[in-house]
Amino acid sequence: MSGASLAPAQWNPANRQWGKDDADDYRVVTFNIQDRICSTNLKQEGQNAWTAIAVQIAALKPDVLVMVECGDNNANGTGAAQGYDTVDTVARLTTTLNLFVHGGTDPYVAGNPAVTAYVTKYAPTFDLPYMYVSDQTDNFNRNVVLSRFPLADLNGDARTAIGTFTLSADAANPYYTAGNAGVRGFLFAEINLPDDRYGGDFVMGGGHLKSGGASGDLSERLVASQRIAYYIDAIFNGLGGNTPDPNFRCSNFPRPNKVLTAQTPVVWAGDFNEDELNNGRDGPVLWTTRAAATSPGATDGTDRDRTDSSYDDSRDPFTNNRNTQGSNANNKLDYICWQDSIAVLRRSFVFRASTMPSTATPPEFANFPGLYFNISAFTDHRAVVADFVLPSPLVPSGHVLTGPADFSQNLGKQPTLGWTAGARVSSYQLAVSTNSDLSSPIYTAPVPSSGPYSLQIPAGLLANCGTYYWSVSATNRGGTALSPSGVWSFQVRGLCDINIDGFVDDTDFVLFATAYDLFETPDGDFNGDGFTDDADFVLFANAYDALLACP
């Protein structure tokens, strides 16, 4: 996949800058939005949850966003009035998400009003155009993922995403039991990242484990997390081998036919409904990252290298509060987990408007028609954000020079130089020099990855009979590579070689005489004054005596 331009990066919250340190960092956001993104909710700009969530997403600009508790019209309290007091269908929620990101006319609220609060209104250069709505529901809500980059089938199972899975027992891995991923499922979406910026692609997992403190709730969360761990290890890691689900325990049909590339991480996030710091047991987050082993660093974890994966310890940048629900400082229920042998955490944080100094509010909050510190109050959870450094791509390749051919002679003084499109390219640069190592170039030109893949050298740079060297380099996040063709050369034609055969002879004299009779013609105008006259004849006579156009 070719890359799109990225917004300038910046991280300085005290100065209202909540962006990434590096534009190529990959930002993951997970957010339990407490039922507020549903088809019957009012979508007009105001002091309401819809607007509050939209300005937060616009401020954070995630590369991928997991939202849970979506589509619950009943719990949101708007379903009955609109005659749809139930969970949104996949199609209905997909339309609602498009309205949330892009605006439009609301087909689900009486009167079909225009949607006036939406993400791209508040962040016009940002978009989340690719969406997956889980087909799993507890008859209340659904999990969703929105992506800046397109979804793609990365493991050969003819799907770009799944909403859940079912496992049979595996005697070789007895830490989990047969069953599914829990009451709301656990989605995985496969994302195709730009090849010129990243060495691999990305898999985003997301879900909302069962809430509650009863023994049945605790048990369901634990067994679901153990199954999630096995699914990640078997399907995406191949249990350490090169074949997905080698023990045939996963219910994926059609079955995947390849594991992920070594530079493609799996990251999973959501509301796990337990705080690993104070739950008094090895909870669901720990199980999904560690799998069976009880000791850190063992060789059966969910990381690609079979060690343990990692999970975040995000804090509010201003208060160091780790809480993601309510006001209790020790109530972190929302987590981001990742395969740390591939994805390196740059930073993570809890995004909480209510504790920001007034000098730290992101510019997008200015669009909220109310007090900024009330924005957090419209949902009972806070967004958790993590920025990852992903593997760099290989340097570009395949940008082959096409012409003029190496060692070409008798070219005009404004030749067109061409090459083919390469792979994994962010930009090209054409260089022309009088030196074979391209040092001290007389002409350079940057070219975007989209081309054009040929450029004409401007007038006034090349001299008759001059020999010049040229090539094209291609650059991406991984580095710069000269064309595999190397450096080519060409020679400009002699000044008076009108028929371009390498000689100034009788044939050229006949052509010059014709031009001399015409007077106002460029054919014999060797001195560039606009006329073919006596001054040009003197030049021609000297060249005629030498015979070779370029002695």
For each feature predicted by the language model, list its residue ranges.
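Metal-dependent phosphoester-hydrolase catalytic domains
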Residues: 8-10, 156, 175, 181, ...
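Acidic, glycine-anchored loop motifs typical of Ca2+
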Residues: 107, 111-124, 317, 497-505, ...
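Recognizes extended acidic, P/S/T-rich segments that occur
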Residues: 429-464
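A well-ordered secondary-structure block
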Residues: 114-197, 206
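Pro/Thr/Ser/Gly-rich low-complexity, intrinsically disordered linker/stalk tracts
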Residues: 393-422, 489-492
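Cellulosome-associated attachment modules in secreted, modular CAZymes
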Residues: 395, 436, 476, 482, ...
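N-terminal, active-site-proximal structural segment of metallo-dependent hydrolase catalytic domains
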Residues: 6-142, 177, 202, 217-229, ...
